[in-house]
Amino acid sequence: DDHDFDEEIREIFVEEAEEVMEAINEYFPKWAANFEDTASLLEFRRGFHTLKGSGRMVGAKVVGELAWAFESMLNKVRDKVLAPDQVMVNLISECLSVIPGLVEDFAGRQPPRINTSPLMAAADAVCRGDVLTTLDVAKAAEQAHAGPAAEADETAAAEAAFDALAASLAPVATAPSAEPA
């Protein structure tokens, strides 16, 4: 039965995610305290890689895409394209703080309670070489924790503004043009 298979895969993913988070939580603080600790960097980066792959495979897209954004950033640190700093540590910490809730939401077949877009955008900005501040990371975290509802409110506000603009332009668009005599 497909339902039983789906449940089994879901349970395996949740167990694996918990194990991966344990490893990340072991190695990330070591690296955060000493950026020269390449072995720890590689270990916790592998955790993001695993979450990306297994999340995508089982349909935990939000977890997979968030993990991919951070794995990409960590790949650049590993390859010495990006120099780590305390802002990056803060950003990774914020990411790690939301993953367990996202996994829990997936396990319970609930929509994600976290809007991961601001955290992914911050990681992408770092990958592009943008300089983020601690305040930028705090804002991204605040927006993430505001949840998908805040994103929906912003979308609704933008749609309402567009509708109002379109309505104000409609009379201009439909007015008969004066033909020269």
What are these regions (language model features)?
Residues 1-181:
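Non-catalytic helical tethers at domain boundaries
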